Amino acid sequence: MGAIDSGNTAWILTSASLVFLMTPGVAFFYGGMVRAKAVLNMLMLEAAALSVTMIIWTLWGWSIAYAGSDIGGIFGDPASGFLLKDSMVAQDGVFTATGLNGNNYPVSVDVAFQVAFAMITVGLICGAIAERVKYSTWMIFVALWVTFDYAPMAHMVWNGGLLSADGAISKAIGAAAHDFAGGTVVHINAAVAALIIVL
């Protein structure tokens, strides 16, 4: 393992912290848009989105999106990074980050940054289902959506899959697709899911 770049690590952790703050911000925004009796429900839906997404991302979501071998350009091998395998190791009772990504910051830092985007993406969908869904149904939806929609889309766009700049579709049409700010994975993905839910 090479040397950790402390500047890159600090910047990614700062960025992850700021993105984490977006989810409660969206919760309060959506809470202000619903009737007074539905504010608590909206806040709880956002809290469920945050909690379930973090659990799914830790178990297998990150692995589907970023770890291991590519399966048809659609998703990564869910078992290759199950439970963030090989990104942290316990040494003398202390968890230590192992492995560096291409920018010399720990993989575990990248996991934190990416889960923040996964959480805000699910949180954006909440506005479409205000006062329309039971809490338990929403939790099941979040688990399934992160597993079968968000993580594969993140893989396809951000990890060299079908829709990436180097992907098969870009090569077939002769024009590279670039998604630097998350327009496809975050905004289009959440908008289409919200539209499908309300229809």
Where are these regions (language model features)?
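Hydrophobic alpha-helical transmembrane bundles of multi-pass membrane proteins
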Residues: M1-L199
